[in-house]
Amino acid sequence: MNYTTNTITIRPIKEDDLHRLWELSFKDKDPEWKQWDAPYYPHEPMPYEKFLERKDKIVEQDDFWGIEAEGKLIGMVSYYWEHKPSLWLEIGVVIYESAYWSGGYGTKALTMWIEHLFTTMPLVRVGLTTWSGNERMVRVAEKLGMTMEARIRKVRYWNGVYYDSIRMGMLREEWEAHRSK
């Protein structure tokens, strides 16, 4: 299963994607994308062989899909359970290559990802957590119709500055109203 627009496709990761995904995500010690994706958590590069040990958690999984543009992998969308018994699910997106930032790729990918999740799961809500230093991510969530549900002030510390943790969310009925516009 995959979803496609005129510019991108989201789809499960295939074994053929592993080397490219490793290059984008774990090859470098200080990748540029990490400045926006929770930079207050350490990022550890890893050798390709060690990355391959995780392939069973990456290839053809329901919770981790690739974003493809112009025939190549440029990012990923994911989800994790904050609390599975209550179906509290959080989503994420990373566009690894800066050439694809601010081009609508993340917005399109998350639109398709949210549609996929609401279509295939009995969810009542989808959430997204980011930080106040990533203003682009906050804008994407707002464009998608998400509501800022919580702003926990000055709990993220990076490069000598405190930032807020931002929790955005959307109920199924809000998504249905948003997508019908």
Briefly describe each language-model feature range.
Residues 52-55, 138:
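Short amphipathic alpha-helical segments and helix-helix/interface helices
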